[in-house]
């Protein structure tokens, strides 16, 4: 059965439909679990060279690093944010370790992704330096949006490394309201993706200096969904609240 949650599955199908970060995909048969025991797999040097080449195609560091299934962005500076290529091996180690620990059977890590860092205007920082900016998650089923939400629920930051101190709640509230024009744009782009792929998907959108970019997707039934309330909602023109 095809692994449709793997970025390598869905990205080639949607990259020409909506704005997405420049992306390089590296597949490997390297037995990476061996690095957790302090050993270098036979294919290690070749894999690292392939990753370096991918980074070079994007103009070098800094880049966004992830597997086909996770970035573990809550450990930002130790995992997905690669500031210097000399730290590539350690970041790969950290992502492999995290992937092995997720749930009971872990996550696959044969697919590796290098992406450009999109220009954003953060309102505060959390999770070891991760820039927090406006993001929304849309759910699309059979080509129609049936739910949308701010990406970040407030409880995500209660135990974070935020340097915003007491201001973070106010700042989060400000970026958690979506204007009508943006909702119309994101709905249209999400439904374009949904019609192209079919099925039920969650689609994540990030506001950048270039506009809205689609950054991630996953099977809708397996994606985190929450109901935004109060100041997170803005009335649509016809008086219907955002779901």
What are the residue ranges of the model-derived segments?
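Short beta-strand
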Residues: 65, 204-205
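Structural motif
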Residues: 144-145, 211
């Amino acid at each position: 059965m095809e692994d449709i949650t793997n970025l390598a599955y869905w990205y080639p199908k949607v990259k020409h439909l909506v704005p997405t970060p420049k992306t390089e995909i590296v597949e490997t048969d390297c037995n990476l679990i061996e690095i957790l025991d302090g050993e270098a797999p036979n294919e290690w040097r070749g894999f690292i060279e392939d990753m370096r080449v991918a980074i070079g195609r994007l103009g070098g560091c800094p880049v966004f690093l992830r597997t086909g299934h996770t970035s573990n962005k809550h450990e930002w500076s130790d995992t997905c944010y690669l500031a210097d290529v000399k730290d590539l091996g350690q970041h790969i180690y950290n992502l492999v370790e995290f992937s092995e620990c997720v749930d009971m059977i872990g996550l696959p890590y044969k697919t590796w992704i290098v992406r450009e860092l999109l220009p954003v205007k953060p309102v505060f920082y959390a999770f070891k330096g991760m820039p927090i900016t406006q993001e929304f998650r849309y759910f699309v089923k059979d080509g129609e949006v049936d739910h949308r939400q701010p990406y970040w629920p407030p409880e995500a930051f209660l135990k974070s490394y935020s340097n915003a101190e007491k201001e973070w709640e106010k700042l989060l509230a400000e970026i958690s309201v979506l204007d009508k024009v943006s909702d119309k744009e994101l709905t249209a782009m999400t439904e374009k993706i949904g019609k192209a792929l079919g099925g039920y998907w969650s689609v994540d959108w990030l506001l950048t200096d270039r506009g809205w970019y689609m950054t991630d997707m996953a099977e809708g039934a397996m994606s985190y969904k929450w109901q935004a309330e109060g100041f997170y909602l803005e009335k649509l023109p016809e008086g219907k609240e955002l779901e």
